[in-house]
Structures are given as structure tokens and as C-alpha cells.
Amino acid sequence: MKHLNSISEIYLKRDQEILLLFRKAKRMVEYPTTMAKLCDYIAKMPASCYYLADSTAYRYVCKRIKGEKPKFGKYQAMKEKLFEAFYQDFLRLRQMEQYKEYKTKHLVYVCLDLPAPNIGMAPRYIQMKINNYFRNKKTSFITR
């Protein structure tokens, strides 16, 4: 559990994955391209796991089980799709025989380790993360 105003460990791992996806995307896109197009491509690439805080994922699943559909802001479409994909994976695992005895909390932890359809961030926020990384790294930014 994270403390007030602290940075969650999962978000640090997510930022590392964004940089890995950035390097992968640079090799895959056709040049000439722009940073915005690269970030749009990264936003659609699959991630190695769900980069959601465990408590947030658990609360979302509990609300969905009760029949409520949590509201997201109008600018959080990517996050809403990610949570919905997470919930569908949760339901799929719940039906499997080997997970029948798992409690909801433990099944959420298992689901968080599954591959995610995307990183769950809008391209502009991905671009901000990448720009901040290279600004703080104090090296030249080469896009090729």
C-alpha cells in the first residue's frame, strides 16, 4: 500500500515499459515520422502486464460485480478500455477450474500479471513521460 503523496512502484515500472515500447516503436514505424505519431503507436501496443494499482483494480472489480459501472472522465477513454479489458480477463479467469477457489482479491493479483491490450495512457501523456525522461537524462535526443 502506498503512502499519501508517494509514487507507487507499479507506476515506475509502467514508465520503464513505456521507454521499452518507445525503443520498439522507433524500430517499427516508417520514417519520416513525428513524436506524436510514435506516441500514438505506443498507446496501441500491448503491454506485458496491467499497470494498475492493486487497490484501484480491486475496487473497480468489486463495483462491477455489484452491477455498478464506474465513471471515467471524458479524457480517460484509454484508461476505461484498459479497466474493461481487465474486468473481462478477471471474469474469464474466474470461470477457469484452477481459479474457482480463489477469493476476489487474490484473483485480482493474478489478473494484474496477465498481458494487457495497451498501456492505458493517452498518447499525449506518454509523450510527456518520454520528454521528461530525456530532459532529465541530459543527453541528446535522437529519434532513430
Report the location of each language-model feature.
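Phospho-regulated, low-complexity intrinsically disordered regions of nuclear gene-regulatory
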Residues: K81-A85, K105-V110
